[in-house]
Amino acid sequence: MRQVFIVPDLIGEPLDEAQGALQSLGSQSLDPQDASGLGRSVSIDGVWRVCTQSPKAGEVVDVRTVVILAAVLSGERCP
């Protein structure tokens, strides 16, 4: 039987909390990216805040689906 989960709305969440939420649902693959376009290395901690996500909230996906979270440093505006 295929294992799936419903993608939660992670926009505005600290990146570490977003990762925890995904892992609790069974997600096995996360790709954090710098939403600013500056190509900075993104660490999974509370210093980064999620701006966009793919797949979108509400989509039903396989646990092996790569979830892309584009984030900016806390205090920065999302592009």
Kindly give the residue locations of the regions a language model identified:
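Ligand-recognition elements built from short beta-strands and adjacent flexible loops
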Residues: 1-79
